[in-house]
A protein has these predicted regions:
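DNA major-groove recognition helix of helix-turn-helix
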Residues: 10, 24, 35, 61
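Residues within the helices of the helix-turn-helix
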Residues: 7, 18, 47
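A short, Lys/Arg-rich alpha-helix, primarily the initiator
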Residues: 1-15
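The alpha-helix within a helix-turn-helix
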Residues: 10, 21, 50
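Short alpha-helical DNA-recognition segment
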Residues: 14-33
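DNA major-groove recognition helix of helix-turn-helix/homeodomain DNA-binding modules
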Residues: 44-59
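Short amphipathic recognition helices of helix-turn-helix/homeodomain-type DNA-binding modules
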Residues: 60-67
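Residue-level signal for the short linker/turn that defines the boundary of a DNA-recognition helix
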Residues: 14-15, 41-44
Length: 67
């Protein structure tokens, strides 16, 4: 079960996990773990990711069609 949509949003925007890791100040391995749903980011990190990617935090956790 996918708990977040970080990887999908990155792909839709054409943004690499490496770029996000640098902007977020986290290692590539940590961002990859978030993107692959091996580790779930805290709410604070999700909010930071949403701000960096310029998306609503809801878009990182649910599909617009599911709302």
């Amino acid at each position: 079960m996918k708990l977040n949509r970080i990887k999908l949003i990155l792909e839709e925007k054409g943004i690499s996990q490496t770029w996000l890791s640098k902007r977020l100040g986290k290692s590539y391995g940590m961002v990859n773990a978030y993107a692959c749903n091996r580790i779930q980011p805290s709410l604070d990190i999700l909010l930071q990711i949403a701000e960096i990617l310029q998306v609503d935090v809801k878009d990182l956790i649910t599909d617009k069609n599911e709302r």
